[in-house]
């Protein structure tokens, strides 16, 4: 089944809602990077969050990059998502696995805080016009949801609730997705809406369990929290979009990257190896560049 993203509003346009499923995208990331259970969860959550943020970009070619730089054993994370529904990403240590811990509900969960450690979340928004907008906030707990909510509050001054989660068992990834609910600028001084948003979100005890219950029915997921949507289900479906793991790497980009190395470095490659092999960090595609191609880059 294809991943997707839907948008809706509630409270007469005062609250913006976006829901996304990233089950298949997370499965592909797991396969490409040989992710562990823990890193599959982290990558899935980060892909969901980045797609939720990218959904508000004004232009279809707009992109959002999430980066975690910290002292934890995860050794960093980078996710790149587009307004067009494309997403890709990787972590520093894809094989990382840690003991499960008990949460406040006495259920076992992944130890995201220990995995990420102490550090920062960087959010880069690029609409293709001028310099990208870069924001940095301290990590809250590494579970991505609260970290993104902190970014939205401190960097964009937007009261928001961000939920990301997954269901993973011994057979693999069952589901992965996220939900964003935020007060729109025109209603940000309406404190009754802020109270409404807080009250509705408090009703969510476990987003991962709710996500698993609803499967890929994103409209039902939103209605579980905001049953009084402004749009009908058919209207929401008509504006939904597909989400997919898609890398922007190509052979042409690989050749351009090699050319930047300069004549001396290319001649060294030709002399020592007679070829070059480049591996994309985001998708693990391998590009083999033969000797004659290296020579042509020098000429």
UniProtKB/Swiss-Prot annotation:
Listed GO MF terms: protein folding chaperone; unfolded protein binding
Purpose of the protein: Redox regulated molecular chaperone. Protects both thermally unfolding and oxidatively damaged proteins from irreversible aggregation. Plays an important role in the bacterial defense system toward oxidative stress.
Cellular component, GO annotation: cytoplasm
Gene that this sequence comes from: hslO
Keyword annotations: Chaperone, Cytoplasm, Disulfide bond, Redox-active center, Zinc
Organism, as annotated: Prochlorococcus marinus (strain NATL2A)
Disulfide-bond pairs as recorded: 247-249, 280-283
UniProt-listed Gene3D superfamilies: Hsp33 domain (3.55.30.10), HSP33 redox switch-like (3.90.1280.10)
Family: Belongs to the HSP33 family.
SUPFAM superfamilies according to UniProt: Hsp33 domain (SSF64397), HSP33 redox switch-like (SSF118352)
GO term, biological process aspect, one: protein refolding
Compartments it resides in: Cytoplasm
PTM text: Under oxidizing conditions two disulfide bonds are formed involving the reactive cysteines. Under reducing conditions zinc is bound to the reactive cysteines and the protein is inactive.
Name of this protein: 33 kDa chaperonin
InterPro entries: Heat_shock_Hsp33, Heat_shock_Hsp33_C, Heat_shock_Hsp33_N
Domain of life: Bacteria
